[in-house]
Amino acid sequence: MEPEKIQTSLPENAYRELKPGEEYTPVMPASSNPKEVTPYSVTMGVVMAVVFSAAAAFLGLKVGQVFEAAIPIAIIAVGMGSVLGKKNMLGQNVIIQSIGASSGVIVAGAIFTLPALYILGLDAAFWQVFLSSLFGGLLGIVLLIPFRKYFVKEMHGKYPFPEATATTEVLVSGEKGGSQAKLLAVAGLVGGLYDFVVGTFGLWTESVSTRICEWGAVAADKFKVVFGLNTSAAVLGLGYIIGLKYAMIITAGSCLVWFVIVPVVGSLTEAVDPAAMLSLLGVTRADIVADPQSIFTAENLFAFIGKPIGIGGIAMAGIIGIIRQSKIIRQAVGLAVSEFGGGKSAAAAPERTQRDISMKRILTILIATLISVFVFFHFGLLDGWVQSVTAILIVFIIAFLFTTVAANAIAIVGTNPVSGMTLMTLILSSLVLVSVGLSGTTGMTAALVIGGVVCTALSMAGGFITDLKIGYWLGTTPRKQEAWKFLGTFVAAATVAGVMIILNKSYGFVGEGALVAPQANAMAAVIQPLMTGGQTPWMLYFCGAALALVLTSIGVPALAFALGMFIPMELNAPLVVGGLVAWFVSGRSKDEGLNKARFDRGTLIASGFIAGGALMGVVSAVLKFVGVDWFLSGWASSNAAEWTGLAMYLVLIGYFAWHTLRAKKEE
């Protein structure tokens, strides 16, 4: 029997909100029976999980950035299918991407917390790192599945899902071939080469700031006012897909920190004793303690005042989100309890594209995972039953409640604020553990491993919603994605644990030539005073929480705004640039059909920029790992390199707009 022919482009209503009574029909409709899970797709997925886990762990610990693995894996899956002459690979490619993308999320969860064990001089064995990552990943999967339908189906068109959009365009274009695949390939080549030249050779800088001008340097030093802009093609593409509305809200958060809070606090240089300031903020970073006056640089004021306010805002926005989504949470829990008790057994079977793992099975896996985590804590970390029960309750409650927050953040900006949420987890867990008699070395180890489990769970929840949205747009079977995600999680956790042990022995995380591991260093700095009676910036956390309440009351999305406060300005400002390009190209004509064609073409080019940048990020990581150093550090640190970067960025924007405006209505 000849397989049913599958369409090779996304439907017109893929990215917009549906009209009343309108249904979304995916690329592979529910009536079709596409190949999804095959020996080829599973093997390729596992290989991708191993390779990208190792690469992401190294790059993340080296520079603190974990590249998103979903896009480069999708490109490789499409490319391999083409090389091997395989046809109708869409379903299999989604499975490859879903298994392989476990790498980036598990890595993010592990490297943000667990290296802090080594930084604090607490040795961690392979099994501790592995089990912490594995259990966190499993919790993230099972806690997200009940919310899949809400985020990917009921909220269709309401969230931009930037990373899922880019990955879906890659997969669809690969299946279609022809002009769309060529356009994506050209955009990927342009974006990839642009970012590769910056990252590997340093011919121009990746970011520019107002410090390159004399007046800008004066403004930074005297008034603590600095404006920064990341010039990478990938972030420009991300801004296009996010759109102008959310980009402006995110950047407004950055503007509040950099143009109001930092200058105001910076103006107190003469009035405030720097040593007292360090004590008040709980700053323990060696270089600042050695030179207290350096706390008043714009960058340090952002790190120690702006970021904590952002963390408080993220936490409160999360709590507000939990309250607002309490109805969905109650429905998911009610469905689980009802099905577990056999109440839904007679219900009609859902169509193929809406079939999840049964609630009974999800609850079984959840209970088994929680029991395993309890055993891990009780026999591997803690002594008493009270401490073990307390630890498991912290993990479950925070992971359960913040799962929706992580998914929400990914749906809006494609960036999961796990480090901010994990800092709050560490603070809360440390306070609770101290109250049940745990402190010092044992307390720090326990809090960090608890943080590792929660961080990985939230990272997985955010990353997995991307996979499920891709599956929804394309028409894969959710149950198959969910089931095989467990395998990807196991493989990624084992790889990350092995790589982290090797990197600790090869480079270390403290001392000369050590890996930077910035997030883990931040975790170590936060947890040490909590467990040893030091100072914690509670007032800043409360300020952020109060700000989130005010923003919510006036109708401004608090999570997006708080994310802007936490994420550096230079990464947020280019989102507005990308959003402005989207607004410009999609409103130039009076012909709505032409505007839509231009916007769609721009989405494809932006996806190419993101994909090319992500793929070249992997190449750069591999080159760094094998010791290839082509970076012109002397030139790259000069003002001339920054001016060159600004000029090249303007050329890139011009190319993006020109190439997008070439769209024809029929396209």
Where are these regions (language model features)?
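Alpha-helical multipass membrane-protein architecture
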Residues: 1-667
